[in-house]
Amino acid sequence: MSLFSFPISTELLPWLLLLLIPPLLIFFLLRSPKNLPPGPPRLPILGNIHQLGSLPHRSLRDLSLKYGPVITVYLGSVRTVVVHSPETAEEVLKLHDSECCTRPKLSITKSFFYDGLGLGFTKWGDYYRDVRKLCVLELFSVKRANSFRNIREEELSRLVNSFSDSASSGSSVDLTANLAKFVASFTCRMAFGLSFQGSGMDNETFLELFTEANRVIGKFAAADIFPGFGWILDRISGLDSSRRKSFQDLDTFYQKAIVDHREKKKTEDREDLIDVLLKLQSQETKLGSSRITDTHIRAIIMDLFVAGVDTSVITLDWTMAELSRHPRVMKKVQAEIREHVGDKGIVTYDDLEALVYMKMVIKETWRLHAPSPILIPREAMTNFKIKGYDIYPGTRIHVNAWAIGRNPDVWKDPDEFIPERFVDSNVETKGTSFELLPFGSGRRGCPAMYVGLSTVEYTLANLLYHFDWKATEEVSVEEAPGLTSHRKHPLHLVPVNVINRKL
């Protein structure tokens, strides 16, 4: 007799089925959530992936117009809830922050972010709290950020002088590429105490490395939506190998910087972030249950580069693009800056607080072009409700910051670039106003927001103070696919010297 045969007579089989069907129905009805947020019908296996397109934040917003501000979609087999209004964002990021402040297990976390040893993709727990405390108190405090002002000034001087040379010859500049080089070089010196030249790389090589990292990070991984077999698809598509190569290139660069610091080979005397982390390592500081290792240091630096550089470049690039498309706003913000600064020849940090209209321009850019259109996903740890709907443990939760910024129930003429909407407005960007979330909010809010905001304000103010800007062609506002909201086409503008003085 076969081990897999059962001696059941055919006469008994119908009765057996009748006995089994009711309890099976009860089981499936009880285990199936009844009160999920509404959403579109899904396909077997694929779920709703076919409805997301290359710009998911736009596709999801369109679905929310039909199904409401909180919707359920399935990414393959993974149940995902997406919120699209300030009210529902507040429920997620404030009211239920403690119930959904962990991260889902994503393939990129293991393959690129040191299996969650950094900050952005780390699971909630003692380790996360320790890393965040370290970042807030040691790496990104106001005092620490201000200690890097001279570096930012030196890098900006190079940028302004380069643009001044282009202005003298009447040639256009690739503003997108130049802004990326500037922010990456500043961040490199802040983290490692060395410039590109000191790192053994030229600008183009480093930017190619960084651009490739952002490209592979921004791609959907089949492993994240088809648990169990998606990794096979990622290997076939080449995503797995491209991630490993990009990670290895950056990891090698970071480790070389650590070794050079130990051997006192860095090119600057200032204390940089590697110095700070190595000092904490020598003091046997613990993160969770482990002492700080070189791997922890590399993981923290990886988060800094991936998040910090990208956010500042995106903001500056979109702001200059929108100003080029809106001459009235460009003239108004330049007038504010030039009237306040006068003939000093440079905008200083002390000037920034008085530049109220410029701050509105930056806010309006963030409203229309959130650097992260959909915030990094959270994962529910317990049962709770959003807008009366049941959220179950293991559900991924996304906040569609782009959709909130264009919500017509919140903003008049939401698709128009009108900085004046922030006159007498109490909307701010630190995470307590859920209408505008450039840095996230709650336990997962960005700890480096002061560094990022200082970079954006100081750079923008000086570019608008020193130069008028002319577009050589119609400025495109088309978005590139990916997790962050890069413009699809480089921004080419002609600088015109106004403050005729090199820095």
Swiss-Prot record:
Keywords: Heme, Iron, Membrane, Metal-binding, Monooxygenase, Oxidoreductase, Transmembrane, Transmembrane helix. It is a single-pass membrane protein. GO terms for biological process: indole-containing compound metabolic process. The keyword Metal-binding applies. Signal peptide: none annotated. Its cofactor is heme. InterPro entries: Cyt_P450 (IPR001128), Cyt_P450_CS (IPR017972), Cyt_P450_E_grp-I (IPR002401), Cyt_P450_sf (IPR036396). Its EC number is 1.14.-.-. GO terms for cellular component: endoplasmic reticulum; Golgi apparatus; membrane; mitochondrion; vacuole. It comes from the Eukaryota. It is an enzyme of class 1 (oxidoreductase). Pfam families: p450. PROSITE patterns: CYTOCHROME_P450. Heme binds at C446. The chain crosses the membrane at residues 10-30. It is found in: Membrane. GO terms for molecular function: heme binding; iron ion binding; monooxygenase activity; oxidoreductase activity, acting on paired donors, with incorporation or reduction of molecular oxygen. SUPFAM superfamilies: Cytochrome P450 (SSF48264). Belongs to the cytochrome P450 family. This is Cytochrome P450 71B6. The gene is CYP71B6.
